[in-house]
Regions:
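Active-site recognition of the HExxH zinc-binding catalytic motif
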Residues: 116-129, 143
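Hydrophobic (often cysteine-bearing) scaffold residues that line and stabilize catalytic clefts
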Residues: 36, 40, 111, 115, ...
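Post-HExxH zinc-binding segment in Zn-dependent metallohydrolases
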Residues: 136-148
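Short helix/strand-bridging catalytic loops that position acidic/His residues to coordinate divalent metals
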Residues: 129-136
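N-terminal, Lys/Arg- and Ser/Thr-rich interaction peptides
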Residues: 2-26
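An acidic/histidine-cluster motif and surrounding catalytic segment
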Residues: 24-34, 47
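Active-site scaffold of zinc-dependent metalloenzymes
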Residues: 69-111
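Zn2+-dependent metallopeptidase catalytic core
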Residues: 37-56
Length: 148
C-alpha cells in the first residue's frame, strides 16, 4: 500500500466544505537559486499530475543553508503537522547549500538531494493526512524509504 495514494483521509476531510483549500503550492525566498526554483517547480508540477493533495500544503523553499526545527535542531527540511485537520500544514526545505553541493557532487546530484528532501517532507504530509499511527522512528524510516 502506497501512502501517497491512500484515501483514508476521506474519513476526516470534507473537500466540499465552504472555504476548503487543496493542492500543492510552492513559495520561494528571493535568494533561492533560479535552477533550484526551476527544478522544484517542475517536480511540483509532476507531483500534482500524479498525486492528490486534498488539503493545501505549501512548501516554503528557503535560501538558508539550514532551518531550525521545532526541537531546535538545524535541519534540511521540516514538516508542520497541525493537531487539527482544519488547519493547513506546511513544509520547509533549505536550499542555501546548493552551490556547495554542485561543487561536491555535480548539478544533477545537488538538485536530486533537494528534491529528495522535498519528497521526504511531503511523505510526512501523507502520514499526517492519512493519520498513520507510527513511532517517530517509524515515520522517519518510512519517509526516507518513500523519498528514495
Amino acid at each position: 500500500m502506497n501512502i501517497w495514494t491512500m484515501t483514508r483521509w476521506k474519513k476526516y476531510i470534507d473537500v466540499d466544505a465552504c472555504g476548503h483549500r487543496s493542492g500543492l503550492r510552492m513559495r520561494f525566498d528571493q535568494g533561492v537559486d533560479p535552477e533550484v526554483r526551476r527544478a522544484c517547480m517542475e517536480f511540483a508540477k509532476w507531483l500534482r499530475q500524479e498525486y492528490e493533495f486534498p488539503m493545501r500544503v505549501p512548501v516554503y523553499v528557503k535560501a538558508a543553508v539550514r532551518i531550525r526545527a521545532m526541537d531546535g535542531d538545524m535541519v534540511c527540511g521540516t514538516f508542520f503537522r497541525p493537531y487539527s485537520m482544519s488547519v493547513e500544514p506546511y513544509a520547509r526545505i533549505a536550499t542555501g547549500d546548493y552551490l556547495d553541493l554542485c561543487e561536491e557532487r555535480g548539478q544533477d546530484n545537488a538538485l536530486a538531494e533537494i528534491l529528495l528532501c522535498m519528497a521526504h517532507e511531503l511523505t510526512h504530509y501523507f502520514q499526517w493526512l492519512n493519520q498513520l499511527n507510527l513511532t517517530p522512528v517509524g515515520e522517519e524510516r518510512q519517509a526516507k524509504r518513500y523519498a528514495h
